[in-house]
């Protein structure tokens, strides 16, 4: 081994052992000073006794002697030290170690990789241990009451941006464990994860190279098969936490899915709504392909000036030209005519959501790229190669991913 690396590891081990001993001494002193009283009634515990407690911490294993006693009011045995430190019965990991391991679990591609990474920074744990703690905490996360941060005394004016999107998660199907004799087994089931990104427009900056960057953003993601009304409630609740009621303007950007626009009318009716430009572009290209054939120079020549008009504040003209396609007599196959009518109707329904030049002048986004980026980040953890989730396993880990992204994770150990 490299001499410098070996020396550094040795010194780190010495410092780690010093930290472990210091932590052990302070914890033992705290435990000794705690009164052996019932946490509910305040009465002395009955039949008290001393027991060993081994606690795994970031610094290593600390070994303590702690009191136990019976609390008649609770009808159970109580350890005052565990109560004071927020440890559940039989919990072996300290809150700080559990928080670090859980964060690692949400960031890397699997529980096995998380275990290997934890071992590299000196806190070895099995992938089964990480899985058990993630599932327990993910279940607890569903019961959290997330507080609304207090606004600063002199808060400057701001606008809020909300982007809605979704992506597909791979779960175990009804025939996941079926034997080889099962005909046409449905081993995999795909379900949508509805997600959203919320940020203040003033937090949108650019790097020196011109790349967009969000200084601060917040995420919403709900488990598979969450009803749109419940997803809308979750988005509205998070938006309120982030200043929805105080925002000067609320920008809402999303694709053309009907359920998204129904949700917007229900929960965010006063928001300035925009159809994601890239989806509008794709539908305009679909019209060009219907008229001139896919991949032809004529299709490109037809669509380019209309895209320029769409971005240049002439969206009403674009919609009118599309409507004229249906007014002019033309001989088309019935299937092509039906498809063309569907695409034109798409733009008619969104004629008030195509003001891209206005959005650009306000510095607001024209597309929902941040929401798509969130989906890709979550997929890196939740849709890796070979991953097929049970519903509880996916739901609990998804909740933890969102908590850590929003920096609400300390509430799990509060």
Predicted regions and their residues:
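Short metal-coordination and nucleic-acid-contact micro-motifs, chiefly zinc-binding Cys/His arrays
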Residues: 30-36, 42, 51, 64-67
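Short Cys/His-rich metal-coordination motifs, predominantly Zn2+-binding knuckles/fingers
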Residues: 38-43, 58-60, 73-76
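Short Cys/His-rich "knuckle" micro-motifs
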Residues: 46-51, 82-83
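Short cysteine/histidine-rich metal-coordination sites, predominantly Zn2+-binding motifs
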Residues: 52-61, 87-95
